[in-house]
């Protein structure tokens, strides 16, 4: 039931970028040791097997601790998660709160709220999993989450171009990843029929045979996010929290189906984004690695 691992020899590569967003700098040389990475993100079916065997409950399925939210109304301290909602028209893209809602009852089984389900989506990436949930699955699987350096090394697929497939986002008009097609955040024409997550492996693999490294869902890494790359940071990491710390943000990689050129041009290996450890959303998933 676990995802097939693809063995990578490791090596040195140039990590980061100075062409897009300041947090991707500086470009620097990083060496990663041999490791193996899952060919695709963890799916709903795979996460379901973990839950069935262990009885695990995700953070989104547990009511928030009142001690962490002093002054919050009891009615607000119920299980739930962040859900993307398309707007009715153009909005100020500087305010993400216009398209994200906290929905009671949203969790990995019901990604968009209590009335939604994952029926017929067993091969879609699992979402509504926070960092702690991803770490728990990885430990159950006898694996771990990748560091940011390991993830970027794998995502590049041996290439040095902007995207794993070249320097054009859609060469010859061909869509290479599940990203937002249309005008964000109010009109999504769908990528090859997908408006939201897509089944893993719909889009072409990179040079290492890995799929969905770019687009579909952002992926958790073990690297704590800083405003710029921290030179000398460990290229590998193997630990994670027993409980999420909302004051700590992890580095997300890969972009998602919500990334669009005019808003989030982060569907590239070098791109990175912060997310607090306790946050689950409709556009974040993960994949695991194993030591080589």
Question: Can you name each region flagged by the protein language model?
Answer:
Residues 1-7:
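GGW-centered surface loops in extracellular recognition modules
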Residues 7-8, 14, 18-19, 63-269, ...:
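Functional-site microenvironments in short loops/helix caps that host divalent-cation chemistry
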Residues 35, 50-59, 141:
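Short capping motifs at secondary-structure boundaries
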Residues 29-35:
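A short N-terminal beta-strand-loop micro-motif at the entrance of redox/enzyme domains
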Residues 22-27, 94-96, 271-277:
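Short, P/G- and charge-enriched loop/turn segments at secondary-structure junctions
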Residues 43:
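Acidic-aromatic/histidine active-site loop/patch
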Residues 282-292:
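Short, structured beta-strand segments at or near domain termini in extracellular proteins/domains
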Residues 38:
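An anion-binding catalytic pocket shared by soluble metabolic enzymes
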